[in-house]
Amino acid sequence: DFDIVTNCEPGQIRKIFKNSRIIGRRFKLVHITFPDEIVETTTFRSDSKDNEGSIEVNEKGRILRDNSWGTQEEDVKRRDFKINSLYYDPFKGEIIDYFGGIKDLGNKNVTFIGDPEKRILEDPVRILRAIRFAAKLNFSIEKSAKKIILEQKHHLYEISPARIYEEVLKLFLSGHAEMSYKILNEYKVFEILFPHVSDVNKEFEDFFLTAFKETDRRYKVGKKLNPGFIFALLLWPKIFKKSNISKNINFRNFYQSISEVTRKQQVITSVPKRFTSFIKDVWMHQPRFQRTGRKTLRFSNNLRFRAAFDFFLLRHSIEPNLKNDIEWWTEFRTANYDKKIKLLNSRGRKFAKN
């Protein structure tokens, strides 16, 4: 994994590559578009406030705008972690290591460059980045940073919900969801990202671990992962506790719970509408797995059926009473039409064959 960085300013890059465009305001960079990929290119930064681009910092030390161009030696000081501060010169074939990043790689450490508190206050998302690196690489975060993360984690509330949403996807959709979940809990950051679930988090730990193991397995075999499915998993405990998911479910209360939980989470993570619709569909289909009837055949052909069924399977880790329903649906799902009618009749539903 590498980034491309240069001493050319964004405008100069734009002139060299006509197939490029400048993006971002807080942190300007350039996307150079090729037929099969987009190459993201950044400019060396500095701490200087003298040049035209400048760097803007608020009273807490948060970097609001970072477009102050500099040299490679200045840029490396702006990096967050030592393992993230290695430069490679493609012309000389050399790795340039200013802060002992190679040593940290060997020791499997995630170490901040400079004062961890200052670096976190500059950008609280570095907390999530540290956790992501530790989860992805099976590294340890430096001990001195743990106390600071515990003290400063509340600053994540000050980050835009859209940015937090993107970071959550990186944590849970990159093949290390199980480890991300464990480290987020260790550093008590899970409760910041999902405050409305934190009170039942421990109770549903087996559900989360089972679900994230399956998520990581799907990632490793190249299966597509839906962001909506991950959020449906992460928020389900609250829906489960607020609603009686059974044959005698109160649908009015169920729908109200779904609207309330998704609305409150949007304040923290701005989930795009297409995925909130997916989340709601997966949840609203859950009672149907325990209520077979005339609409069961049509339901099994629903666009969201497979996702809802996969979700239903994961629920078994905390709802052992679903065993018979899961076995019935597993057989029903792959049966031909005649067999499906027999299975429905076995549940006391009298259906005639066409």
Language model features with spans:
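Catalytic cores of the polymerase beta-like nucleotidyltransferase superfamily
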Residues: D1-N354
